[in-house]
Amino acid sequence: MIKVFVRAPLLSRSGYGEHARMIVDALSTRPEVFDIYCDPINWGATPWITDFGHKRKYYDFLTAKKHNYKGTYDLSIQVTIPPEFKKYAPINIGVTAGIESDRVSPAWIQHANIMDLMIVTSKHAHAGFLRKDVKVQLPNGQIQELLYSAKTEVINYPVKYVEPEDLSEKISLKNDYNFLTVAQWGPRKNVSALIRWFIEEFHNEEVGLVLKTNKAKNCMADRMLCTDMVKQVIAAYPDKKCTIHLLHGNMSEEEMHGLYLHPKIKSYITTTHGEGYGLPLFEAAYSGMPIAAPGWSGHMDFLCISKEGKKNRQTMFEKIGYDVKPIQEGAAWEGVLEKDSQWCYAKEHKTKSAMRKLYKDYKAKKNTAEKLKESLFETHSEDIIQKQVVDAILKVAPDADSNWVSKITEVATL
């Protein structure tokens, strides 16, 4: 068996937490091959999952195994940003969502290059490492071009098989048509602009926008902060007839999937500047929601489908026009979001037009969304994605024969 050390935000309620659990769950499908030990790390200020079902108990078991084990490992898998990558074992695999802008920091490339394999969530995440114009200064003062050289696999998230909770009574909405957006409130998600443009487009109509958000955590102080931020935006529109609904706090998987299927929540809208993948977008897509989003970054992997015999993929969402421009000064984060990087800016009139089309042509847009849902359950099933993860790892794993069980033709009786 291969002793695997997994360092990841396994218990974090975050995108990287989801990614970590995806990797561990995939490894766990091959218990005859992988002996798993987990070190769950924090992920910023995000809370930990509060579900104490059988999966959480299993993750706790893998954590206890690691604490009690003092030996070495054959393979390490690290789900985090590249500057935190280290060589914990003879073979090391980095797993990351990359960056939401058009390029990663040079330090990310340097650290990724020490990995034996990189697994990224999307083609956009991979592209951020592949730019040819990256320069670094050597200790002797020389400027040298930095090229990405790590072997890389692009593996998307799988669909989740969750029994959605009926939220029609728990979340009472007065309007029959409501848009939904799920976003942590920060520079990248562009929430303030979305609220403004929604109000301006539907100012005199009884239409709603359900905003599931937080700033950092899911505590009462965070809720009050988000409430104040929403009030600041809507204060400029005192006579509006449309409605903004703020949802805040922890929601279970069953509740979140119930939100996507709420009978009065019809469509999903985002004006994000960029996504490494876009998990809420993905969940909305495989739940059959019509979607409007900028046609740029990680979510393009799953919002378009391939058609047999055709080179170009078919767009299955309402594409919002955009410009690619430098990130805002306040969004720059040295070593993560470099000030010379760029991401997309949804155009105001295109966003309003996309929302109007989802509202006016709902029946046709819903039909397209159902076709996308059907396709995603075929291409992104848990079995398919978990096999992709396992196969990618076994390509670099030490002395691993993934087919050893199938090659046994006879068991001797002694």
Annotate each language-model stretch with its function.
Residues 5, 172-189, 195-198, 209-211:
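Conserved donor-binding/catalytic core segment of Leloir-type glycosyltransferases
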Residues 1-73, 387-390, 414:
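N-terminal pre-catalytic "stem/leader" segment of glycosyltransferase-like enzymes
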Residues 5, 45-131:
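Extended catalytic core of nucleotide-activated donor transferases of GT-like folds
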Residues 258-276, 286-289:
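Acidic donor-binding loop of glycosyltransferase active sites
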